[in-house]
A protein has these predicted regions:
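Structural and coupling elements of P-loop NTPases
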Residues: 1-609
Length: 609
């Protein structure tokens, strides 16, 4: 018989990037007494990955737990970006309700829509937390209306529309239920969670059922499965059967060697866990997301939503440039292969395939951000490699027609730039679905656009809107192929010879376009050192020295004025490269180069193409 476990609440937090979700969790941890008074708490405690802290994005779902009035509240932090949507769908299976965190000025954002839609489809109750109410430009009353409009757009039920609103300033550590209340602490939010989020249900007397929803990885114990106990109990040394709903015939017996629950930010070893508990289980080799751990007497897998398929792919290639091996610690194909396959332990939305060449691996993911985060992580770990331009993964329908991944693009731009943005996105096969003007002088545009139309567009968008535009995208399924798109109108400036860049050579080269390098930098033949002002590629000699005579002294070089080079970030470089180019990634440098370095062989290849 199913019973409610009143001492547990399982909730997920949904929020757009930078709306204060992680700060809110930090405050709940502090005010529930998880940290000692004298303990230093790193800001953004939930974002444990360096890139997450720097970019302010959450990539991997994290688990934490706090206690309030004798009730254990398990909090799961969901990624706010659609590229990591693979994480989101699975996390929501573990919880009985969600907290939607919305900025009191910006209101609900498109990325939030993606996760919220999944939560509403699963019929989860929602608490809306309007955060940052202490911002001078906050407009909480309007934001409430916007949230309710969003709920209606997403076909929320009447019960879901009747959700509680909590107003908070996570930074100040306070929450209130009415705007007229005096803020004191986070108590109103804690109380709302206990009152509104239902306790987990399950049959304690039934056989064990634990659905693995996320995978953690630890060098010492290997793969760790994290999931909720749906029925029965699970104990250390218990024999269980691993079975997957998508392959119910494959069963194997294993033993639970260690069992953990979450307390604060730590995993705490326990001997057994009952219905509603969120547990981490180690000692089961080859455990995967979607596996159910069942008692051997009645191995019934829990139905599980398949992980979203990748939409974009890149080739990761061993670096073979003339400067290879000088800056990285891990440079061989064995290093690259091991690292990419290790990533599969924790990132289930990723695919890694071997190719005809032992030096190259095809890596597929959910979007450019997804793959760029992997590249940045590897770079920081000391890896050196090259990557190709991102390519879109096509499919065919039952009639053999070509389908391509589509995205919904939501754009907020100052009114004067809306015409430029509409023109650019239309050229990239975007279809304008709606357009509305806000009183603040901003225009909101909604487009349906092929994923390949967005590759390389973000940098252009920021330039076109002078940095004032906001562009958010969400994967929107597969649609009919929209035809060819005309891309970059500007060619590359290619180094003609290897050596060191000289001021004199750069001074002559800068007339041709924008340079990416400074004097003294090492270059090699076939390396892209700048962007041409015209459509074709041009070879230039940046190592050219001035002929010295009695009347021409080298000190005259100091009078040459160089325009500062354009330093490309990883994302900008990935956007810039063309299909015949590679991005060389090392711990210290990002260099763009032609796939074929030799100029004669390159010309021959271009002729045959």
């Amino acid at each position: 018989m199913k019973t409610k476990c009143e001492t547990i609440r399982n909730i997920a937090i949904i929020a757009h990037v930078d709306h204060g979700k992680t700060t809110l969790v930090d405050e709940l941890l502090k005010q529930s007494g998880i940290f000692r008074q004298n303990q230093e708490v790193a800001e953004r405690v939930m974002d444990s990955n360096d890139i997450e802290r720097e970019r302010g994005i959450t990539i991997l779902a994290k688990n934490t737990a706090v206690y309030y009035n004798g009730v254990k509240i398990n909090i799961i932090d969901t990624p706010g970006h659609a590229d990591f949507g693979g994480e989101v769908e699975r996390v929501l299976k573990m919880v009985n309700g969600v907290i939607l965190v919305v900025d009191a000025f910006e209101g609900p954002m498109p990325q939030t829509k993606f996760v919220l839609k999944k939560a509403l489809e699963l019929n989860l109750p929602v608490i809306v937390c309007v955060n940052k109410i202490d911002r001078p430009e906050a407009r909480p009353a309007e934001v409430i209306d916007e949230v309710l409009e969003l709920f209606i757009d997403l076909d929320a039920s009447d019960e879901q529309l009747d959700c509680p609103f909590v107003f908070a300033s996570a930074k100040a550590g306070v929450a209130i239920l009415e705007l007229s209340d005096t803020p004191q602490s986070m108590k109103p939010l804690f109380e709302t969670i206990l009152d509104y989020i239902p306790a987990p249900e399950g049959d304690e007397e039934a056989g064990t059922q634990v659905l693995i929803s996320t995978i953690d990885y630890n060098e010492y114990v290997g793969r760790i499965g994290v999931g909720k106990v749906d029925n029965g109990k699970i104990r250390v040394n218990q024999e269980v059967v691993v079975v997957n709903a998508h392959e119910p015939d494959k069963k194997r017996k294993v033993k639970v060697s260690k069992l953990y629950e979450f307390e604060g930010l730590k995993k705490v070893e326990v001997t057994e866990a009952s219905v509603g508990s969120i547990v981490a289980i180690s000692g089961i080799t080859d455990i995967h997301i979607g596996d159910t751990l069942c008692s051997p007497e009645n191995p019934q897998p829990i139905p599980f939503q398949k992980i979203s398929e990748p939409t974009i792919a890149m080739h990761f290639i061993v670096n073979d440039s003339p400067l290879a091996g000088k800056e990285g610690k891990f440079v061989t194909s064995r290093h690259l292969r091991e690292r990419l396959f290790k990533e599969l332990n924790t990132d289930v939305s990723l695919r890694v395939e071997e190719t005809d060449s032992t030096e190259s691996f095809k890596v597929s993911g959910r979007g450019e951000l997804h793959l760029s985060v992997l590249i940045e992580n590897m770079r920081r770990e000391g890896f050196e490699f090259a990557v190709s331009k991102a390519e879109v993964l096509y499919r065919e329908d039952e009639n053999g027609k070509k389908l391509e991944p589509m995205e919904k693009a939501y754009v907020d731009v100052p009114d004067e730039f809306s015409g430029t943005v509409i023109e650019k996105l239309s050229n990239r096969k975007g279809e304008l679905l709606s357009m509305s003007t806000a009183s603040s002088g901003y225009t909101r545009l909604e487009f349906s656009i092929p994923s390949r139309g967005l590759i390389g567009y973000r940098g252009e968008f920021m330039t076109d809107t002078k940095g004032n535009g906001i562009l958010n995208t969400i994967f929107d399924g597969y649609g009919p192929y929209k035809g060819d798109i005309a891309y970059r109108k500007q060619g590359s400036l290619i180094a003609f010879e290897s050596g060191e860049a000289i001021t004199y050579g750069l001074f002559n080269a800068q007339e041709r376009g924008t340079l990416f390098i400074s004097p003294g930098e090492k270059v090699y033949s076939g390396m892209v050192v700048g962007q041409n002002g015209k459509a074709e590629d041009v070879e230039i000699n940046v190592c050219k020295k001035k002929q010295l005579t009695n009347t021409r002294s080298s000190s005259a070089d100091e009078a040459l004025r160089l325009t500062p080079p354009r330093i490309l970030s990883l994302e900008q470089a990935l956007e810039f490269i063309e299909t015949d180019e590679l991005l060389e990634v090392t711990p210290k440098s990002l260099r763009i180069r032609k796939k074929i370095l030799d100029p004669l062989m390159r010309k021959r290849a271009n002729r045959t193409n």
